[in-house]
Amino acid sequence: MPVSGADPKPGLPLPSGPSTPASVQTLAFARDPVGALLSARAAYGPLFTLRFAGVGPVVAIADVDAAVRLMDADPQAARAGEARRRILPQASSRSSFGADADRHRAARGRIESAFAPARIERLDGGLRRLAESHVDHWPMGRPFRMLPRMRTLTQDVFVRLMLGVRDEARAAALVAAMRRLLWTPGNPPLTPPDRDEPGGPLVDAVFRRRLRPVAQLLDEEVRARRGNGTPGDTILDLMVASQPRLSGEEAVDELLVVMAAAQEPPSIALAWLVERLARHPEVAEAFVKAGPGDPVRHAIIDETLRLRPPAMASLRRLTAPFDANGVELPAGTMTMAPIPLLHRDPESFPDAEEFRPARFDGNLNRPEAFRPFGGGARRCIAEPLARAEMHAAIGVVFNRLRVRALWPRPERPVQRATVLVPHRSVPVLTGARLPASPEPAR
């Protein structure tokens, strides 16, 4: 199988797509990614080419069969790490997020057991206690935005439960430093300095400055954990114990990307779930009554992930030709399986724009179209954690509070790097739920 990292050769045709300049397409996609994808599919069918400033042509594969084959393809022939690094230069080639082939398998293998469903299930009590401590400090009777609150919660969960940071001062400092880092404008920068894009160097400079204290705190924790020598099952413990031994710099490099990738999408998913339940009080009531582990809760969570997936797409850069249902895409092509389009496939999800959790009662026409966590060898490693956070945190929120959306119109997704965030960050008004009831354990 020929392997090449080069772009498609000049003259090799790509599928048709919008003819507007790349800068115009980039702006339109950032403002309304779902609308841009739906318009392109309506005009050009399930296979079309978009052009993004600083990235170039990207072929969108919205046919379910072809998209599933792309996600499940040989990782050497369809490289996710290379595609991510092209979009996100901060994605280190040494991390499980930005690596490919053997390096990806090694990086993922080092931390996989920390995300094992059995281990995550044991964290349920800690998840609920952290959620309760955060919800207790939310404003009552005055508006606030839900997304920043959920970011702080997921950062706290990751630092304390997934990394296992026991030093209270260091844990608090790391959560605060991660919060500042993830609030960097454009983070991860859409216009990095190695591309001649306005504002790229400035945005990246802010990102690098806020990155330093996070890296320093992680390095301190790695050193402390190595000095302790006590085995454990947290991500840090597994990295410290890995063979061959990682240098401190290598461990921090991997941790930085894993921290961002394992926190940002779950916090967005939590905010979207609050937004959906605040606009559908009857569904919120069903969520509360169902209790942890009930199929009703699973269905509500899955329908939210279908209609409002945090991830924009599964990205792959081809190193060998790929047959997209009769259309051969050449090696070097940047491709994406756009998750919002897969989740709006009319055959798989009739009346796709309706928020209807009952569709997940086990009778999906094509369950393979539901891909909120991607697929294949690059399926999101943090899926068990994200689902546990949605069950535990949202259970606490709606057992304790009545939540009302401030705006009459639903939030729309906007692009932020490779994720889709609510454009107003979910402004809500909360009041006490009477009588309040504790969230039972799983």
Regions found by a protein language model. Give the residues of each.
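Conserved cytochrome P450 K-helix/beta-meander segment immediately N-terminal to the heme-binding cysteine loop
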Residues: A337-N363
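Conserved cytochrome P450 K-helix E-x-x-R motif and the immediately C-terminal K′/meander segment
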Residues: Q25-G45, P292-V327, P346
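Central I-helix of cytochrome P450 enzymes
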Residues: T154, F158, L211-D219, L238-G291, ...
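Cytochrome P450 heme-binding "Cys pocket" and the immediately downstream C-terminal segment
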Residues: E383-V419
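Cytochrome P450
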Residues: V3-P13, A36, R51-V59, A80-A83, S92-E112, A118-R129, W138-R160, A169-A176, ...
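Cytochrome P450 catalytic core segment centered on helix I
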Residues: V3, L14, A177-R245
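N-terminal membrane-proximal hinge/A-helix region immediately C-terminal to the signal-anchor transmembrane segment
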Residues: M1-S92, F97, A106, S133, ...
